Amino acid sequence: MIRFEELKKGADGLVPAIVQDQNTLQVLMLGYMDAEALAKTQETGLVTFWSRSQGKIWTKGETSGNYLHLVSLAVDCDKDTLLVRAIPDGPTCHTGSKTCWGDAVPESQGFIRELEAVVKGRHEQMPEK
């Protein structure tokens, strides 16, 4: 459990939270958390932020239905940024794009590419039956 009081906050009292897709490793969005958002995220398993534009707490997906389901949280070495690994229910961006960067951030294949290469190599080395 990450304790908000142990994190270094910006002048606004918030901590940036980078959200990454657990399965593809693609960076989905950047949000900001205050103590309440972090606590709610850890308690409910639904990623929650502080909306700087609306000045209130919001759970990603509460309007669209495209929730981000928390898998893990990590703190960087400076203790001033969070990495949120999540499984998205649908597009993350309010525009309908998978990420808040549109197509500018290519989908990572993570370990799948490596696994695919191993399987292909072993298949090629199999004796014929």
Where are the language model's segments positioned?
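Flexible "arm" and connector segments at domain edges
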Residues: 1-129
